[in-house]
Amino acid sequence: METTTPKSLYMMTLGCPKNRVDSEVMLGTLRHRGYTLVQEASDAQVIVVNTCAFIGPAKQESVDSILEMAELKKSGACKTLVVTGCLSQRYGEELSKEMPEVDHFLGTSAYAQIGDLLAAEASPRQVIPDPDYIHDANTPRINSMPKYTAYLKISEGCDNACAFCIIPTLRGGQRSRPIDDIVAEAKQLADSGVQELNLVAQDLTAYGHDLPGRPKLHDLLKALVQVDVKWIRLHYAYPRIFPDELIEVMASEPKIARYLDMPVQHVSDKLLLSMKRGRNSEFLKGLLTKLRERVPGLVMRTSLIVGLPGETEEDFEMLKEFVKTQRFERLGVFQYSDEEGTAAYDLPDKVPQKLIERRWREVMAIQKRINREQNKKLVGKRLEVLVEGPAPETEHLLVGRHQGQAPDIDGMVYINDGLAYPGEIVTVEVTEAHDYDLVARVVERPDPKQREHTARDAHPAPLPVAAMQRPAPRAE
């Protein structure tokens, strides 16, 4: 027997954009069943915490968030607390014993069952099947990003066996979506007003090897550029498989953003071998050079890990020199987290935590100088910017992003002079540079026909901004 009374729902999402997509599928599924989405957890009868368990700090954040939401069962309207995602997949059985206040634990392949689970009067407390699910274009989904941008998950799981990574255990082997299904969802997003598609997967460049006919990422991109969006951005493109055909599509198709998120993790051959990355430093440097040469204006984001077991001072100096030489426009640095169940967990020569933190600070300081120098070179330049809306700090500024700035993880462009609709792609002139952000003025807006298309569901009039108001620089 199923309950039919509509309930209020609050969703908390932790972790990566791929996890966000899972949350959006749950939101769509539950709204389809009559649930009302609320902005405050204290107003919700049902709270869902979609967790991350990639590294130690992420696990702790997930546990803290669950406990925070559990307090609302005592004092607020919450009647049902559901924990989903990677933490449930990894520790669901243990957590069910330690957290009696949680009603249900769903693994990474069970989130699509959440509607049936909540509708039934009697349902299991743990639903943690082997990870084998991925949604399709027919699955209800609510885009939780600003309506002009969206993540598009093209595959789930990973067939790599990187020594430091627990993801294949949590998410299963690679499962690619067929090209026509991905294109169908992309069209749905475009019809809803999305201007920017951010392609995500555990391993973007391995796309298709598990499908009949073994299509490649460049085949998918050739199909996606036919969709009515302005930018298509590539995230998590592993360097191990990077054919020339992919580089050619990136260089020749205007809709493919001049931006690439490609995690290299380290440059020491000894550590790359122990990490099981499948490529050496010579290959990585050659690929980076090829990308810079063949894709003019490419903004490169990468991620590195410091403190891997066996990382010596010589290895670390090599890494710092690599960062100085390559001058990545965007860089994320992770402190190694010793995760039980990974190959690296059993490696000898662990690096002390204080030393890991020192190395992290050193690399970030180098990158901060690089960011500042690169941003200063943009002053006086003209850029195309996707306007997102009023700045969080003040309604007298607009914020947006140029092609070299991905949502959530990179800097912003603050617009302090001109008119623009949220969702418009406008031409700006950069007037000021900070370490991570830029300040600019609008110099050209789209033609009226495009303006009508992008603003159809936005504001009734373009948003003005006060001339020459400066945003406060961000501390990062």
UniProtKB/Swiss-Prot annotation:
Domain TRAM, by residue range, is 376-444
- The record places domain MTTase N-terminal at 7-123
Record domain Radical SAM core: where: 144-373
The UniProt entry lists the main location of this chain as cytoplasm
The record's cofactor note says:
Binds 2 [4Fe-4S] clusters. One cluster is coordinated with 3 cysteines and an exchangeable S-adenosyl-L-methionine.
* Record's GO cellular component terms: cytosol
Entry keyword annotation includes rRNA processing? no
One Pfam family recorded for the sequence: TRAM_2
Q: Report the EC number(s), separated by commas if there are several.
A: 2.8.4.4
Q: Which InterPro entries match?
A: Elp3/MiaA/NifB-like_rSAM, Methylthiotransferase, Methylthiotransferase_CS, Methylthiotransferase_N, Methylthiotransferase_N_sf, NA-bd_OB-fold, Ribosomal_uS12_MeSTrfase_RimO, rSAM
Q: Tell me the CDD domains matching this sequence.
A: Radical_SAM
- Keyword S-adenosyl-L-methionine: yes or no? yes
Using the UniProt annotation, give all residue ranges assigned to the region (Disordered).
Answer: 445-476
Which stretch is the leader sequence?
Answer: none
For [4Fe-4S] cluster 1, which residues are the binding ones? C16, C52, C86
Role noted for this protein: Catalyzes the methylthiolation of an aspartic acid residue of ribosomal protein uS12.
* HAMAP family, sorted: MTTase_RimO
> What protein is this chain from?
Ribosomal protein uS12 methylthiotransferase RimO
Q: What is the lineage of its organism?
A: Bacteria, Pseudomonadati, Myxococcota, Myxococcia, Myxococcales
